[in-house]
């Protein structure tokens, strides 16, 4: 039996990146390999409960003072403006020499780092160990990004931001508009240069690891491997492996503001596929007028629902009175009739989605939420906002055909979400399309994918085989290196 590997995991300090990569780290630790997650002091509190005999944390103080940040602000979930985001990014860059020193003085057998740490590719090369790139996205989205590069990119051939174009060269016909592309794709800027730097660092790396399963987008895994010249390991959905018990589902990295019993007792009273779940991830705070439109659409749709709303808890000093974002008597009426539940803060999303009464999900199309929706087998209403979320929308609606669009027309920076209102009529129509008779076929396809997701993570499933194959590859590389040193 080969000796265990020594692996370092370096997650980006944002929930959408930290949660899936820490879950990936746990998969390796559960196989008996020695895993160290490198993170900052405040972020360690989110991960401490996952430490075991084979999973430890290495803590590095973030130089917040040098970056002009308040003590304890160490995660992008706490950032609401571009100036603070820039300071946090700068503070993170100051950690590079400290992390390099730690890794160099205690070399691992492999470095698994988020794409936002391109310098780890050169560090791994110096240490003669493989670097695995972690993308907090799916390979379909990565293929879409590749299609938007170069002088022949399809968005360069249209005459307006709202003219529909086909993304050529993909396994499926995919259509979108220029307005739905990230700003750094539409008009190259400094971030475009960063994207190219991250891409070059990826090409130097051993391969790519994603929280997905091969059967979801197999043609895109092969397509991307051919473009980039290295292998893709789909080893998810990690939540399906790690959070099979309801205790795990309700307490992931962040603490939910409602208890398991409160959620389950309400959901248990509902018919199968009758509840619509609304949540826009860990960072989205819509303006009041957009929240009002969502509430009005939920009310007029007739659907039973759970709605998770950030920034509207009673302790939030920026929160206006409920009359600013809810129709008069809305919450009281929903409670009295049992039609709806509003969760003001972090919701136990996996627990909710996995309940048989939930049949639909309105999502911002962040990859973690998307793969959780797929795993649960629910139809989706897509409401992309920024990052690669419009690409994920096209996967859901055009390739997998398990959802409908809410009607969001423009990509925005995360600080500008809700600038262009999506009206209640569009929202209501999308909810009815997923939850009504028209959504039966969508939900059927979603259930089929859910079955495939669960099979993928079982012993002998594609994700389990990929995990074991990657471990074998890394052990072979380590053993070959040791043999050369010995000779």
Swiss-Prot record:
Pathway membership, UniProt: Secondary metabolite biosynthesis; terpenoid biosynthesis
Keyword terms: Transferase
Protein family per UniProt: Belongs to the UDP-glycosyltransferase family.
Enzyme category, top tier: transferase
UniProt-listed InterPro entries: UDP_glucos_trans
Active-site residues per Swiss-Prot or TrEMBL entry: 17 (proton acceptor), 114 (charge relay)
Assigned EC number: 2.4.1.-
Annotated function: Component of the oleanane-type triterpene saponins (e.g. saponarioside A and saponarioside B) biosynthetic pathway, leading to the production of natural products with detergent properties used as traditional sources of soap.
Stretches of the chain forming a coiled coil according to its record: none
Protein's name according to its UniProt entry: UDP-glucosyl transferase 73CC6
Provenance organism: Saponaria officinalis (Common soapwort)
Expression (tissue specificity): Mainly expressed in flowers and flower buds and, to a lesser extent, in leaves, stems and roots.
Residues holding UDP: 282, 346-347, 364, 368-369, 372, 386
Biotech exploitation of the protein: Soapwort saponins possess anticancer properties and are also being explored as enhancers for endosomal escape in targeted tumor therapies. They may also serve as precursors for vaccine adjuvants.
Biological process according to GO: glycosylation; saponin biosynthetic process; triterpenoid biosynthetic process
Taxonomic lineage of the native organism: Eukaryota, Viridiplantae, Streptophyta, Embryophyta, Tracheophyta
Gene Ontology molecular-function annotations: UDP-glucosyltransferase activity; UDP-glycosyltransferase activity
């Amino acid at each position: 039996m080969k000796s265990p590997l020594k692996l370092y995991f370096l997650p980006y300090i944002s929930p959408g990146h930290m949660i899936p990569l820490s879950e990936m780290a746990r998969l390796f630790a559960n196989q008996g390999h020695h895993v160290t997650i490198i993170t900052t002091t405040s972020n360690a509190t989110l991960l401490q409960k996952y430490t075991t005999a084979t999973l430890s944390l290495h803590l590095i103080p973030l130089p917040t003072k040098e970056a002009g940040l308040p003590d304890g602000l160490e995660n992008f979930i706490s950032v609401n403006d571009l100036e603070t985001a820039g300071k946090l990014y700068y503070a993170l860059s100051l950690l590079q020499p400290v992390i390099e020193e730690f890794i160099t003085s205690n070399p691992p057998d492999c470095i698994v780092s988020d794409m936002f740490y391109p310098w780890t590719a050169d560090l791994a090369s110096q240490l003669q160990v493989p670097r695995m790139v972690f993308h907090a996205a799916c390979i379909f989205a990565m293929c879409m990004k590749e299609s938007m590069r170069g002088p022949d990119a399809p968005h360069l051939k249209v005459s307006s931001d709202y003219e529909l174009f086909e993304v050529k060269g993909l396994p499926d016909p995919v259509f979108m508009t220029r307005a739905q592309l990230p700003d750094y794709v539409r008009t190259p800027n400094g971030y475009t240069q960063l994207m190219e730097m991250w891409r070059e660092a990826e090409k130097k790396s051993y391969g790519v690891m994603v929280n997905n399963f091969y059967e979801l987008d197999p043609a895109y895994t092969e397509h991307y491997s051919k473009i980039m010249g290295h292998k893709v390991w789909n080893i998810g959905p990690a939540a399906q492996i790690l959070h099979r018990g309801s205790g795990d589902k309700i307490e992931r990295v962040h603490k939910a503001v409602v208890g398991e019993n409160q959620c389950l007792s309400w959901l248990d009273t509902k018919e199968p596929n009758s509840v619509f779940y609304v949540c826009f991830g860990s960072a989205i705070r819509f303006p009041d007028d957009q929240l009002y439109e969502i509430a009005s659409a939920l009310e007029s749709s007739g659907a039973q629902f759970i709605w998770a709303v950030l920034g509207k808890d009673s302790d939030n000093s920026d929160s206006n009175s409920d009359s600013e974002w809810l129709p008069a008597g809305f919450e009281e009426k929903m409670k009295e009739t049992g039609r709806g539940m509003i969760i003001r803060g972090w919701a136990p999303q996996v627990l909710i989605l996995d309940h048989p009464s939930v049949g639909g999900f309105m999502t911002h199309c962040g990859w973690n939420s998307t793969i959780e929706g797929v795993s649960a087998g629910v139809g989706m209403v897509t409401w992309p906002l920024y990052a690669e979320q419009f690409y994920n929308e096209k996967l859901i609606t055009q390739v997998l055909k398990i959802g409908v669009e809410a009607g969001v027309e423009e990509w925005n920076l995360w600080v500008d979400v809700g600038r262009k209102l999506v009206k209640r009529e569009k929202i209501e129509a999308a909810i009815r399309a997923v939850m009504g008779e028209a959504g039966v076929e969508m939900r059927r396809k979603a259930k089929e994918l859910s079955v495939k997701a669960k099979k993928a993570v079982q012993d002998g499933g594609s994700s389990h085989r990929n995990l074991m194959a990657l471990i074998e590859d890394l052990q072979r590389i380590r053993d070959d290196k040791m043999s050369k040193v010995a000779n």
